[in-house]
Each structure stands twice: as structure tokens, then as C-alpha cells.
Amino acid sequence: MGPLATRGFTLVEILVVLVILAIAGGLAVAVLDRDERGMAAREAKRFAGALEYAAARAQSRNETLGVTADRAIRFWRREPNGDRWLPLDDDDTLAAHPLPEPFSAAPFTYAGQRIAGNAIVPLRASGRNEPFAFALVSPAWRVMLAADPLNRVTIAGPVAIAP
């Protein structure tokens, strides 16, 4: 080495290290995103917010809305002149939301009684809704979402499901 030689890293070496760090960071995010318990909590919060928003919208627009859940959360609007339910497609917040694998959801109770899994739970324009509950489940976790007559949604869980 001569007197003008300097020690350091070349641009290529620095770029290789940055690529390795980016790949490791991407893998870490992918692993963390697969945390079922965390996903259950996030999906429950999203669903609870959508339920409260839908109840407020039903009151403010004087319309009856409904909600169903299975592999996706769907909101419906009841025709004013009939008994038909139409998919609600004019609101991004209430657009159909597919649940990530392996989650599913179902109505659990309505007005204190068990309810069929394919039932539409109504959200009345008057704001006087019966209490209802939905279950959000995966093979390992269960979250219960319960709405009271004042349209406040509480979240219980995630709770581990015994094998």
C-alpha cells in the first residue's frame, strides 16, 4: 500500500450489505404479519369500527343497514319499499372485506338469542338496535365483538382456543 491508499468500503460492498438488510427486514415483516393473535386483534378492531360507523350512518341517512359475516364481512342496505337486501357498494369503509386465512366470522347472538350463521343483522335507522354479537375465529384464536343498544361495540379477546 502506498501513501495515497485509503482504507474503506467500496460502493458495491455497501450496496450488497443494504440488499441483505432489506431482504432480512422483509422476511421479519412477513413472519410478524403471520402472527395469528395479532391478526385477530387487528381484524376485530377493523370490524368493530365498521359496525359503529354503519350504525351511525344508518341513523344519519335514515336507512336500514345490515351486516353478515362468513369468510368476508359484508354490509347491506334494505330497500325502503320492500324486504330485499342490496349489497352496500357506495362506501369504501363498508365495502365487502375478505378475512385473511384462516379466519372466519359469524353472527353469534341477536336480542339475547342464538342466530343462524347466514342471518343479516339489522342496524336500524332509528338507532334502537337489539344487542348482538359476532365471533371472529381461527383454529387457534377467538374474538367476540358485542354491540349494545347504544351501538357501542366491545371486543373480548383474542382468547386461545383449547386444542
Predicted feature locations:
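N-terminal helix-rich module
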Residues: 1-3, 12, 16, 23, ...
